[in-house]
A protein has these predicted regions:
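Negatively charged, low-complexity tracts enriched in Asp/Glu with abundant Ser/Thr
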Residues: 1-54, 79-88, 92
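Non-transmembrane, interaction-prone segments in cytosolic or luminal domains
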Residues: 30, 67-70, 95-98
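Residues in flexible loops and secondary-structure boundaries
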Residues: 57, 68, 78-82, 98
Length: 107
């Protein structure tokens, strides 16, 4: 696991903890896709935050070719198709920003 995905994972975990404290009815889980994406031929790693009750997931993707950029998308649990929500510099994707994305998309 590369340092940038570790940093992203840490930010996502902190944001998810805050989100679940604020919205006790929400049950979200964190996932890491590192080898799974590479096994599919994608030169990338991703962190997911899944909501089973809404059947939705936020996906934060870092491409090997752009290690300081995080693509953020939303999709359905178990699906591969994503709608792009935006791109962020890794160092600007704060815990507060991830909480905001969770509030906008998983409530």
């Amino acid at each position: 696991m590369k340092n940038n995905i570790k940093e992203l994972l840490n930010t996502a975990v902190q944001a998810n903890d805050l989100f679940m404290k604020r919205y006790k009815e929400s049950a979200t889980t964190i996932g890491l896709m590192d080898q799974a994406l590479r096994n599919l031929g994608n030169n990338s790693e991703a962190v997911t935050i899944d909501s089973a009750s809404l059947n939705k997931k936020l996906v934060f993707i870092i491409l090997d070719s752009q290690p300081d950029i995080v693509g953020v998308g939303i999709g359905i649990n178990g699906g591969e198709d994503l709608s792009l929500l935006g791109q962020y510099e890794l160092n600007q994707l704060t815990t507060a920003k991830v909480v905001n994305l969770l509030e906008e998309n998983l409530l």
